[in-house]
């Protein structure tokens, strides 16, 4: 009977991070379970270049020092020379995290359950196979909740005529006017004729591809981009609430990624925070770490409740962007804002609805 040093359930970005950051320089035998075909996955992860992300600078595919936030009438441009906005593709991250000294065995199976068995864990897959490991890293998705917001998105990688895009400036949020939801277009210009164009919704409902494609096509036509070739696509749903998966009582069970509380729900940013989570686990040797400070979590909850209970067209985001400079804005998005920046953020929000949510 083979007993692995650790079992990773789900070989997405957080599972890959465990393999690289915690076990990459060891000779340990690790087993990972992934029931989907990740060989075709190639979405992009966006983040600002914080100190904890600098060790991965060599695999960054593009950096932007300028970004815009606005709508049809208003455009706010931010600049940060020290902490640019960056992207890493899933394939780059996967290749980087699989380049290790350890011995990783990948099983294309779905884990049905696991439980303590003697001094280790028995893992049972959907096809009734049994595996054993000393430690469990569980990254399985957090289920959507009725009445809670999600950030759901669909994007296409396109190739256009020359000099279509300003490759030195990304569109972080271009809000469109919708009847009852918050919607914006997000554009990553990788070159003058190649970009990811993404449609994103903050909503209690999940929208289908047809709806997203219409929003993308409407935006492209509005900007006279009528002829393009589609080179790829990506989609996803990110919960805009903190995971309520209980902290495991067993020190050898570790919840990671969104399941472990890595997501910053007010923004939907996950990738850089799950890396921070795994780094903290390695450095502290703890099975549960707090990624987001108490005040950040409190502000997130207030902001999300405001979005849930008030009709928001993007004006609050634009006003926020107008009252912060680039460095202040990225520090807010990455959970590193100073006390003075937090005061600016609070002063920017609509007073009466925001105060109601504080005492809600």
Task: Explain the meaning of each model-derived region.
Residues 178, 182, 236-255, 264-265, ...:
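FAD-binding beta-loop-beta segment adjacent to the flavin cofactor pocket
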Residues 279-360:
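C-terminal helical "tail/cap" subdomain of flavin- and related membrane-associated enzymes
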Residues 11, 100, 104-228, 241-245:
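Predominantly flavin-linked oxidoreductase catalytic cores and closely associated redox partners
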Residues 49-109, 114-119:
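A conserved beta-strand/loop capping segment in the N-terminal third of enzymes
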Residues 243-307:
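Conserved mid-domain beta->alpha element of the FAD-binding
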Residues 1-14:
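Beta1/beta-strand and adjacent pyrophosphate-binding region of the FAD-binding site
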Residues 14, 38, 142:
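Conserved Rossmann-like nucleotide-cofactor binding loop
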Residues 17, 21-74, 154, 158:
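N-terminal FAD cofactor-binding segment of flavoenzymes
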